[in-house]
From Swiss-Prot:
Name the record gives this protein: Type III effector protein HopBA1
Gene Ontology cellular component annotations, sorted alphabetically: extracellular region; host cell
Compositional bias annotation for Low complexity: 1-20
Effect recorded for residue 169 to A: Not translocated into the host plant cell and loses the ability to trigger host cell death
Signal peptide range in chain numbering: none
Region (Disordered): 1-31
Stated consequence of mutating residue 112 to A: Translocated into the host plant cell but loses the ability to trigger host cell death
InterPro entries reported in the protein's UniProt record: HopBA1
Compartments (UniProt record): Secreted; Host cell
Phenotype when changing residue 83 to A: Not translocated into the host plant cell and loses the ability to trigger host cell death
Record's function text: Virulence factor recognized by the A.thaliana disease resistance protein RBA1, which triggers plant cell death. HopBA1 enhances RBA1 self-association, which is necessary for ectopic autoactivation of host cell death.
C-alpha cells in the first residue's frame, strides 16, 4: 500500500505561517499527515482544485492515483482532468474507458508509449480506477502542429509551446467541470506546467493547490519551503 511507502521516515509537520504568506486565499495549505494517500486525499478535502505535477515515466504517481481513487471520491472529488488525452478526443476516450484498461492503454499508446510500457499500464489503470470510483475523467490537452524535438534548441522551443497550452488546459478543465457540476477537481499533468505556482497556482490557470513529489525514497511528505514550484511535496519511492 502506498500509505506505507514513506512510513520509515517521520512525516514533517511544518508551520504554514511563513509558507502561506501572500498565497491566494482560495488555496489551503496544511502540513501533510499520514502516508501519500492520506496526504493527497487531505489536500483534495481542503481545496476545490488540486494540481498533481506528474513526472512522466515514474510509476509511483499513477499508482498513488489508483490507490486514492475511492477515497478521493468520498472526499468530494467529482472530476479528474488529465494531460494524457486531447480534449477533442473526449468521445473516443470515454468509449475506451467504458471498455476497460486494455482499451485505454491502446488509446494512449501512440502519444505516450515513449515513456515506457510499465508507466503507460499504470496510467491506464489509474484513469480506469478513477472512472470506476465515479469520478468523471476528461482530457484537456490540445493537438500541436510540431514534430517531436531532437536538438537542444528544438526541445527549448517545444517546451515553450507546451507551456503556452496552460490557457487551453484551464479552459478545457473548467468547461468539463461545469458540464458535470463538479464541486472539486484534480488536474493531472506534467510538473513543468505548474512551476512558479506558490502564490496563485499555475500560470494562466485557476488558483489551486499544487502537489509535487520527492521520489528519492529518503524524504518525507512536507510543505514545500524549498522553491516556488508547488505547495506540498509527497514523498515516496519509485519502483
Amino acid at each position: 500500500m502506498l500509505n506505507r511507502i514513506s512510513s520509515s521516515s517521520p512525516t514533517s509537520y511544518v508551520s504554514s505561517g511563513s509558507s502561506s504568506a501572500g498565497i491566494n486565499p482560495s488555496i489551503n495549505v496544511r502540513p501533510p499527515r499520514g502516508g501519500p494517500v492520506d496526504t493527497l486525499v487531505g489536500a483534495a478535502s481542503d481545496n476545490n482544485l488540486v494540481y498533481i505535477g506528474d513526472e512522466h515515466g515514474k510509476l509511483f504517481i499513477p499508482k498513488l492515483i489508483t490507490e486514492s481513487a475511492a477515497k478521493l471520491k468520498n472526499a468530494g472529488v467529482d472530476h479528474l482532468a488529465v494531460e494524457f488525452v486531447k480534449h477533442s478526443d473526449g468521445a473516443a476516450f470515454r468509449e475506451a474507458l467504458s471498455d476497460g484498461k486494455s482499451a485505454v492503454k491502446h488509446f494512449l499508446e501512440a502519444s505516450w508509449g515513449r515513456h515506457g510500457d510499465a508507466w503507460l499500464d499504470k496510467v491506464s489503470e489509474a484513469l480506469c480506477s478513477a472512472h470506476r470510483a465515479g469520478i468523471y475523467v476528461s482530457g484537456i490537452d490540445r493537438k500541436m502542429a510540431i514534430d517531436q524535438p531532437k536538438t537542444p534548441m528544438q526541445k527549448i522551443l517545444y517546451m515553450k509551446k507546451r507551456l503556452a497550452l496552460n490557457v487551453a488546459w484551464d479552459a478545457a478543465a473548467t468547461r468539463e467541470a461545469s458540464a458535470v457540476c463538479a464541486n472539486k477537481s484534480i488536474v493531472w499533468g506534467g510538473a513543468g506546467h505548474f512551476s512558479n505556482s506558490k502564490t496563485d497556482g499555475p500560470k494562466d490557470m485557476r488558483p489551486g493547490l499544487v502537489i509535487s513529489f520527492d521520489l528519492t525514497g529518503r524524504g518525507s511528505s512536507r510543505i514545500n519551503d524549498a522553491d516556488e514550484h508547488s505547495h506540498i511535496v509527497i514523498a515516496g519511492e519509485d519502483n
